[in-house]
């Protein structure tokens, strides 16, 4: 019971600090920015818990190449590329009526950003190698430790995608500032 009280107290403080409760009323995208180790993942999970979303699909964008991220997000059909021995449901389809958490979103290439933008805007996409249109209603929560304005200015991140994923923004304090 003492650990439960401790966790509840921490959650109350986080809600208060970041006004997270207001974010859970809506299904609009949330963008979390903060240095490594500041709790971006914790905030994303907290949004999921407070919004009582049943599904929470987590994707670390920095661990995939362009080809693999497309397959992971959108799925693929058997034979669509070497090694595609079976059909695979994409994580965006799996996140239907739930939340997809795109961690380290800054790591996506411009090509992947373009495809993701279309899927976010239209809530539909084609799996790799398929002509079957998949519709999926998902909420995007994304995070990065990078300065997005600098990346946009340098042409490394699409301004239109950033506008779509950052309806609500949470800027976490650095560890020094805390």
Question: What is the predicted role of each segment?
Answer:
Residues 166-178:
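Interdomain coupling/hinge region of P-loop NTPase helicase/AAA+ cores
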Residues 153-157:
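Charged helix-capping and loop-helix junction motifs
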Residues 65, 164-166:
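Short amphipathic alpha-helical segments, especially helix-boundary/capping motifs
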Residues 2-135, 140-147, 151, 174-177:
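AAA+ ATPase active-site-proximal loops
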């Amino acid at each position: 019971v003492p650990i439960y009280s401790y966790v509840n107290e921490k959650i109350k403080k986080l809600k208060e600090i970041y006004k997270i409760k207001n974010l859970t009323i809506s299904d609009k995208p949330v963008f979390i920015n903060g240095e490594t180790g500041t709790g971006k993942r914790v905030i994303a999970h907290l949004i999921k818990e407070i919004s009582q979303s049943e599904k929470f699909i987590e994707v670390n964008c920095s661990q995939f190449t362009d080809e693999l991220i497309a397959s992971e997000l959108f799925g693929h059909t058997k034979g669509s590329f070497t090694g595609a021995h079976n059909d695979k449901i994409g994580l965006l389809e799996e996140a239907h009526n739930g939340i997809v958490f795109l961690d380290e979103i800054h790591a996506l290439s411009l090509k992947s950003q373009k495809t993701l933008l279309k899927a976010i805007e239209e809530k539909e996409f084609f799996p790799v190698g398929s002509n079957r249109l998949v519709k999926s209603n998902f909420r995007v929560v994304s995070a990065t430790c990078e300065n997005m304005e600098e990346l946009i200015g340098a042409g490394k991140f699409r301004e239109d995608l950033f506008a779509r994923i950052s309806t609500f923004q949470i800027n976490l304090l650095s560890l020094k500032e805390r």
